[in-house]
Design a protein with these regions (language model features):
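Position-specific recognition of the canonical hydrophobic site in helix A of tetratricopeptide repeat
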Residues: 30, 37, 64, 70-71, ...
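Register position in tetratricopeptide repeats
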Residues: 38-39, 72-73, 106, 137-141
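Helix-start (N-cap) detector for alpha-helical repeat units in TPR-like alpha-solenoids
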Residues: 25-27, 60-61, 94-95, 128-129
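Alpha-helical segment of the N-proximal tetratricopeptide repeat
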Residues: 24-51, 55
């Protein structure tokens, strides 16, 4: 009888270990991807983010990281697809709105960029008010 609590604890540990290990691996891949992208090793970054997505396929942050890498490579269409995919996974993910606004600015779709920046800010993402004002000025000049 005295062993029962220890057996239960051991069983709980065995059952929870794979989930904890998977979470550790996801974060490890994400960290590798961020470091690789910061040093310009974009292909390695994409590989790391793909590995993370295999373990956690519905994570909008990881999808957004992939989009940021594509954006850094100048692959705006691929980046835009990633940001939109992230927003489908979580329509309240402010960073994806912010990143999509960067693409929209390059495409000179300033009204849409302003809307995305405002949405990102309303969701708590740190957007400088001066940047929104700049986009508003560009949008007004375009009309």
């Amino acid at each position: 009888m005295k062993r029962l609590p220890y057996v239960a604890l051991a069983l709980l540990f065995v059952l929870l270990l794979p989930a904890w290990s998977g979470a550790q691996n996801v974060q490890s891949y994400v960290d590798q991807g961020i470091k690789a992208s910061q040093s310009g090793r974009y292909d390695q970054a994409l590989e790391a983010f793909d590995q993370a997505l295999k373990l956690k396929p519905n994570d909008p942050a990881i999808v957004t990281y992939k989009g940021i890498v594509f954006y850094a490579q100048g692959k705006d269409d691929l980046a835009l697809k990633q940001f939109e995919a992230a927003l489908k996974l979580n329509p309240n993910f402010g960073r994806a709105y912010y990143q999509r606004a960067m693409i929209l600015e390059k495409q000179e779709k300033f009204d849409q960029a302003v809307a995305d920046l405002r949405k990102a800010k309303s969701l708590g993402y740190n957007v400088e008010p001066n940047f929104i004002a700049l986009m508003e000025t560009k949008a007004a000049a375009q009309r």
